[in-house]
Regions:
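Conserved catalytic-loop aspartate of Hanks-type protein kinases
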Residues: 216
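Conserved short submotifs of the Hanks-type protein kinase catalytic core
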Residues: 110-124
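ATP-binding glycine-rich loop module of kinase domains
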Residues: 32-81
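Catalytic-loop of the protein kinase fold
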Residues: 154-171
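AlphaC helix of the protein kinase catalytic domain
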Residues: 125-135
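Short beta-strand micro-motifs within the conserved protein kinase catalytic domain, predominantly
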Residues: 98-113
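Activation segment signature within eukaryotic-like protein kinase domains
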Residues: 142-143
Length: 271
């Protein structure tokens, strides 16, 4: 990751810091001098297909020809490109993280591609909630914003597939302006194995079913629960108790069994 950060080559933008990463890629803060004494900042997600160079060799070792493996990964890149173009067409929706540009580059060895997705730079929901008190009205606005984003996307046949707090962003809030909650990072969950440690995915997806509009709505509900429950998912200990890996595993089993969720710590009965 550090080598990629140092060698990041994206148009005239320079890396500032690494913001995070997951199995789908790494996100950086980048900056560019506009030539008039101002510096623009943005977020850049870099996704590699295949995710690791050895993935190519593994498939060849399993009996596929290099040409077949290249064609397989090329189809994934084409699907991602179509998804990005579809999201670009609706990125002016106020509840979607604005996508400003995307670039696809083939590797020099012909065995893969890097996909660069530049978006507006905003704090994620966990970072925002750590520094801003929030009440029931804020959570209602959060839910309304995420549902509005999904309505726009599902109408176009776009399923997110990986809704979690880190993929929700917060804009506005300056000079008493009301904040806007935005959904970002669309479509990447469909091109990697299901993350069985994702505690916001619907149980059927964790069990192998494809993502769907219904599973997106389930994940929104889990995000709202998390926000109302001191940023803890169902069935795990509440603060100040630390959450252990065993707690998460047991909580996941309870969700998969369909156990009734305990009420979150905050929020009215009506909510």
């Amino acid at each position: 990751m550090e080598e990629r950060f140092r060698n990041l080559d994206y148009q005239n933008w320079k890396p500032v810091r690494t913001l995070g990463g997951d199995s789908y890629g790494t996100v950086y803060e980048i900056a560019r001098d506009d030539g008039f004494g101002m510096v623009d900042h943005a977020a850049l997600k870099v996704l590699s297909i295949p995710a690791a160079p050895e993935d190519f060799d593994t498939l060849v070792a399993e009996g596929r020809t290099p040409e077949e493996v290249t064609a397989l990964f090329h189809r994934q890149v084409e699907t991602i490109a179509r998804q990005l173009m579809a999201v670009d067409a609706i990125s002016d929706d106020p509840n979607l993280l604005r996508c400003e540009d995307h670039v696809i580059r083939a590797h020099a060895d012909g065995r893969g591609w890097d996909i660069y997705v530049r978006t507006e730079l905003l704090p994620s929901l966990p970072d925002y909630l750590r520094n801003h008190p929030h009440g029931e009205a804020d959570i209602i606005r959060l839910g309304a914003g995420l549902c509005s984003a999904l309505e726009t996307c599902h109408r176009r046949g776009i399923v997110h597939g990986d809704i979690k707090p880190r993929n929700v962003f917060v804009g506005g809030g300056n000079f008493n302006e009301q904040v806007t909650y935005k959904l970002g990072d669309f479509g990447m969950a469909q091109f990697s194995a299901v993350d069985n440690t994702n505690d916001f995915m619907a149980p059927e997806v964790l069990c192998g079913a494809p993502v769907s509009p219904a599973s997106d709505l389930y994940s929104v509900g889990m995000v709202l629960y998390w926000a109302l429950n001191e940023r803890r998912i169902p069935f795990v200990p509440l603060p100040p108790t630390a959450v252990e890996a065993s707690d998460l595993a047991i909580a996941r089993e309870q969700r998969l069994r369909g156990d009734p969720l305990p009420e979150p710590l905050h929020g009215s009965q009506a909510l």
